[in-house]
Regions:
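Alpha-helical transmembrane segments of multi-pass membrane proteins, especially transporters
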Residues: 1-4, 8, 36-44, 129, ...
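Short, amphipathic, aromatic/basic-enriched membrane-interface segments that mark the entry/exit
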Residues: 69-81, 95-103
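Membrane-interface helix termini and inter-helical loops of multi-pass transporters
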Residues: 22-37, 64-69, 146-156, 178
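Structural signature of hydrophobic alpha-helical transmembrane segments
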Residues: 9, 14, 40-48, 98-108, ...
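Juxtamembrane and boundary regions of transmembrane helices in multi-pass small-molecule transporters
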Residues: 34-78, 204-234
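Generic alpha-helical transmembrane segments of integral inner-membrane proteins
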Residues: 45-53, 87, 91, 134
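Alpha-helical transmembrane segments and, especially, the helix-loop junctions at the ends
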Residues: 1-29, 52, 173-178, 191-217
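Transmembrane helical segments that form the transport core of multi-pass membrane transport proteins
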Residues: 88-186
Length: 234
């Protein structure tokens, strides 16, 4: 699970849709696909090589026994049919990210389709997380309106985007760090690399780490300490 978490953090940095911070920074920065690739692909390639070395050199000792339940062919077909609307919506969203379609009509389309297909999904949305992001935008806007604070933060961040992104991610997680720091720098390539590499630090440094720990703790509550120990060592 720990290696999967590390792989998720490092692998997700390779594309604009790989993780929330990439999606946000790609949308606000105006970076082209080529500029984005030059910023993150070298690190992704190095990370892939290191993970392959670890996978093929470590002893094959499973952390815990996992039981996989086999699904019937009928159930598999039902699941596939149910995925079709979501795959279509995913395609539309990808076109928005690629700046082929405007986001406004796609947003309306997604909301209507979800309401028709599975309106219960609206009850499972993490509205607190969305509100947190909204508060970050408001906070950044307020800080930029205070000349002294704005100049101080710009002086702290500009020219140090990589290091600042890594350090800030350890404290407030990399998605909030990306949102916060983007208001005080124009070096989006350095910031992009910093918040992605910063996700490998503490448990709270990335949403992927928090999510994996949450699911692990729910399934194996007596093994939480072991997970934290292994995660910290890696």
């Amino acid at each position: 699970v720990v290696l999967e978490t590390i792989a998720a953090n490092l692998g997700s940095m390779a594309t604009p849709i790989g993780n929330p911070q990439n999606l946000y920074l790609y949308s606000v920065s105006g970076l082209t696909a080529g500029e984005f690739a030059r910023a993150v692909l070298p690190y992704s390639a190095i990370a892939f090589g290191m993970l392959m070395v670890i996978v093929f050199t470590q002893r094959e000792v499973p952390l815990l026994d996992v039981v996989v339940k086999e699904k019937s062919d009928r159930l598999k077909k039902e699941i596939l049919r149910g995925l079709i609307p979501y795959l279509i919506l995913l395609g539309l969203c990808l076109l928005v990210v690629l700046r082929v379609l405007p986001w406004q009509p796609v947003l309306v389309c997604v909301m209507i389709v979800i309401f028709v297909v599975n309106r219960k999904l609206y009850l499972s949305v993490d509205y607190f997380l969305l509100l947190t992001f909204l508060c970050f935008f408001i906070f950044i806007g307020n800080m930029k309106r205070i000349p002294e604070v704005n100049e101080l933060l710009i002086a702290m961040v500009q020219g140090r985007e990589l290091l600042t992104g890594i350090l800030a991610s350890q404290v407030i997680s990399n998605v909030p760090a990306a949102i916060l720091l983007s208001g005080f720098s124009r070096d989006f390539s350095g910031l992009l690399t910093g918040v992605n590499l910063g996700g490998l630090g503490t448990l709270i440094a990335s949403l992927a780490s928090l999510i994996s720990f949450k699911f692990f703790a729910r399934e194996y509550p007596n093994q939480k300490g072991r997970f934290l120990k292994v995660f910290t060592l890696w």
